[in-house]
Amino acid sequence: MTSHFALFDLEPDFRLDQDRLAVRYRELVRRVHPDRFAGAPEREQRLALEEAARLNEAYQTLKSPSQRARYLLSLQGEELSQETTVQDPAFLMQQMELREELQELQDSADLAGVARFKRRLVQDQEQLNEGFAACWADPRRRDEAERLARRMQFLDKLFAEVRQLEERLDD
């Protein structure tokens, strides 16, 4: 089966030109859009739908830094479970502190505080992305890359919680 990277004519690397990925995605998905196959035989319609779904999945995976990191690791035979926790005590403590801070922001309905919290998370995410990219470039650092990918997963979950909180506070 063709890799997500090959679908978009990209080299398998963590650093991606997101604009190029988006342009290529739009080009490819336009070719298999269901409207183009409305009068086609049922088999062709089904194949076009399957290809569109495959392109969507690949695009969503490559667009997200944490999903892209997990995918790269999976190409090397390293499967990261969504449920596996980080075994780093310092990071576990940081997770607890961040969750407590988010809970306090929720309890106080502090929308400005949530915005500041989110900016800090964005900075943390950028640091993790840079760290993963550096580790990925060096095959001897794959264990560290895996550790960073797990941290990226945690931040993704925390971002989802922040978005939910923002929606509740906006109502």
From Swiss-Prot:
GO MF annotation terms: ATPase activator activity; protein-folding chaperone binding
Q: Keywords for this entry?
A: Chaperone
Listed GO CC annotations = iron-sulfur cluster transfer complex
UniProt domain J: residue ranges: 3-75
Q: Name one GO biological process term.
A: [2Fe-2S] cluster assembly
UniProt cross-references to PANTHER family, sorted A to Z: IRON-SULFUR CLUSTER CO-CHAPERONE PROTEIN HSCB
As for family, the record states: Belongs to the HscB family.
* Listed name of the protein: Co-chaperone protein HscB homolog
* Organism of origin: Azotobacter vinelandii
Q: What is the lineage of its organism?
A: Bacteria, Pseudomonadati, Pseudomonadota, Gammaproteobacteria, Pseudomonadales
Gene from which the chain derives: hscB
